[in-house]
C-alpha cells in the first residue's frame, strides 16, 4: 500500500492536474489533510478525518508563540469537500496512470509481437536465385563468346571469299585477254590461210602459165623444125644467124629457175609461217586449257565458299535468334526478381515507417507518463509537506 499526505502553505496557491480542475487555499488558514492510502491503480483509497487549523503567524518560517485557535467543527464541510475533491482527483490521476501503464504494456506487447512477425526474423533464402542468375550469366557469356567466334569465322570466310573473288576476277580478266589474243591469232590464221590460198592460186597460175609456155614452146619448136627440114641449104656469105633454139632453151631454163625459186621461196615462207602459227596456236591452246582448268577450279571453290558462307549466315541468324530469345526470357525472369525485390523493399520501407511511427507514439506516451509521474511526485511532496506542517502545528499547540 502507498501512503500519500498533503501539506498546504498559508499563502494562496493553486495547481492543476490532468483533469483540468484546480485547488485553491486561502491565506491565514491551513488544514490538516488526512492520510490517504491508495492501492495500485487508485483502488481501495481511504481518507482519514481532517481538521482545520488557524494561525495568525501567516508563514512557515515564523515562530509558534501566537495564539492558536482550533476547532474540530470549524469549516468541517469545506474540509470534507476539499478532501473529497482531492481524493477524486488523485483517484483520477491514479486511474489514468494505471490506464496509461496498461496501454503502454499493450503497446509494448504489440510492438514485440510485430517485431517478431514483421521484424528482421529469418531472412529469406535467395541463394538459389543467385545460383540461377550466375548460371544464366555464364550461359549468356558463353553464348556471347561463341557468337563472337562465329562472327570472327564469318569475317574470315568473307575475307577469304573476297580474296577468291579477286583472284577469280584476275583470272577472268586474264582469260578474257587470252581469248582476245586467241581471237587475234585466229584472225591472223585466217589472213595466213587467205595468203596461202592466194599463193596456191598464184602457184597454180604459174604452173598453168608454165604449161602454156611449154606447150607454146613445143609448138614453136615443131614449127621451126618443120621449117628447117623443108628448106634448101644455101650457103651465102653473110653474118651468122641467130640460134633461136638456144635462146629459147636459155629462156626456158631461166623461167624454170625463176619459177622453181619462187615456188621454193613461197613454199618455205608458207611452211615457216604455218609452223610459227601452229606453235603460237599450240602455246595459246595449252595456256587457254590451263586457264580454263583454273577457272573451273576457282568456280568450284567459289561455289563451295558461297555454300559455306550461306550455311554460316544461317547459323549466325539461328544463333542470334536463340541469343535474343534467351536474353528476352532471362530478362523477364530478372524483371520478375527485380519486381519481387522492389516489393520486399517497399514492404521493408513501410515496416520501417510504421516502426518509426510507433516509436514516436511510444516516446510520446513515455513523455506523458514522465509528466504524470512528475505531477504525482509533486502531489506527494505537497502532501508530505502539508502533513509535516500540521505536525509542527500540533507540536506547537501541545507546547
UniProtKB/Swiss-Prot annotation:
Residues 133-224 are annotated as: Coil 1B. Heterotetramer of two type I and two type II keratins. Interacts with PNN and the actin-binding domain of DMD. This is Keratin, type I cytoskeletal 19. Residues 79-114 are annotated as: Coil 1A. One of its GO terms (cellular component) is intermediate filament. The modification Omega-N-methylarginine is found at residues 7, 24, 32, 43, 51. It comes from Bos taurus. GO terms for biological process: epithelial cell differentiation; intermediate filament organization. Residues 248-386 are annotated as: Coil 2. Belongs to the intermediate filament family. Residues 79-390 form the IF rod domain. There are two types of cytoskeletal and microfibrillar keratin: I (acidic; 40-55 kDa) and II (neutral to basic; 56-70 kDa). Residues 115-132 are annotated as: Linker 1. The modification Phosphoserine is found at residues 14, 22, 35, 40, 57, 71, 394. Residues 1-78 are annotated as: Head. One of its GO terms (molecular function) is structural molecule activity. Residues 225-247 are annotated as: Linker 12. The modification Asymmetric dimethylarginine is found at residue 24. Residues 243-389 are annotated as: Necessary for interaction with PNN. Transmembrane segments: none annotated. InterPro entries: IF_conserved, IF_rod_dom, Keratin_I.
Amino acid at each position: 500500500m502507498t501512503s500519500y499526505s498533503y501539506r498546504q502553505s498559508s499563502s494562496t496557491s493553486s495547481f492543476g492536474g490532468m483533469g483540468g480542475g484546480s485547488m485553491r487555499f486561502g491565506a491565514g488558514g491551513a488544514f490538516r489533510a488526512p492520510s490517504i492510502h491508495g492501492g495500485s491503480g487508485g483502488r481501495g483509497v481511504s481518507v482519514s478525518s481532517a481538521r482545520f487549523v488557524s494561525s495568525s503567524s501567516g508563514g512557515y518560517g515564523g515562530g509558534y508563540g501566537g495564539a492558536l485557535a482550533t476547532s474540530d467543527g470549524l469549516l468541517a464541510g469545506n474540509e470534507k469537500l476539499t478532501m473529497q475533491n482531492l481524493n477524486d482527483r488523485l483517484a483520477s490521476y491514479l486511474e489514468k496512470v494505471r490506464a496509461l501503464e496498461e496501454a503502454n504494456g499493450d503497446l509494448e506487447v504489440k510492438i514485440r509481437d510485430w517485431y517478431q512477425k514483421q521484424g528482421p526474423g529469418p531472412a529469406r533464402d535467395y541463394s538459389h536465385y543467385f545460383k540461377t542468375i550466375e548460371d544464366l550469366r555464364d550461359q549468356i557469356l558463353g553464348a556471347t563468346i561463341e557468337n563472337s567466334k562465329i562472327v570472327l569465322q564469318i569475317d574470315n570466310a568473307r575475307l577469304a571469299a573476297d580474296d577468291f573473288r579477286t583472284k577469280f576476277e584476275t583470272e577472268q580478266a586474264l582469260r578474257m585477254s587470252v581469248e582476245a589474243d586467241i581471237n587475234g591469232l585466229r584472225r591472223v590464221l585466217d589472213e595466213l590461210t587467205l595468203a596461202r590460198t592466194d599463193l596456191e592460186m598464184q602457184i597454180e597460175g604459174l604452173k598453168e602459165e608454165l604449161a602454156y609456155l611449154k606447150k607454146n614452146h613445143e609448138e614453136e619448136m615443131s614449127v621451126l623444125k618443120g621449117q628447117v627440114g623443108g628448106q634448101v641449104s644455101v650457103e651465102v656469105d653473110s653474118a651468122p644467124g641467130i640460134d633461136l633454139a638456144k635462146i629459147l632453151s636459155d629462156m626456158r631454163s631461166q623461167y624454170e629457175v625463176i619459177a622453181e625459186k619462187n615456188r621454193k621461196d613461197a613454199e618455205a615462207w608458207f611452211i615457216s609461217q604455218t609452223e610459227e602459227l601452229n606453235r603460237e596456236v599450240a602455246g595459246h591452246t595449252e595456256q587457254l586449257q590451263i586457264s580454263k582448268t583454273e577457272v573451273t577450279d576457282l568456280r568450284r571453290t567459289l561455289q563451295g565458299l558461297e555454300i559455306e558462307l550461306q550455311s554460316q549466315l544461317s547459323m549466325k541468324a539461328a544463333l542470334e535468334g536463340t541469343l535474343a530469345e534467351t536474353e528476352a526470357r532471362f530478362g523477364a525472369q530478372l524483371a520478375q526478381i527485380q519486381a519481387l525485390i522492389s516489393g520486399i523493399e517497399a514492404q521493408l520501407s513501410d515496416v520501417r515507417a510504421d516502426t518509426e511511427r510507433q516509436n514516436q507514439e511510444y516516446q510520446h506516451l513515455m513523455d506523458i507518463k514522465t509528466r504524470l509521474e512528475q505531477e504525482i511526485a509533486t502531489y506527494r511532496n505537497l502532501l508530505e509537506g502539508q502533513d509535516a506542517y500540521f505536525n509542527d502545528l500540533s507540536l506547537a499547540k501541545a507546547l
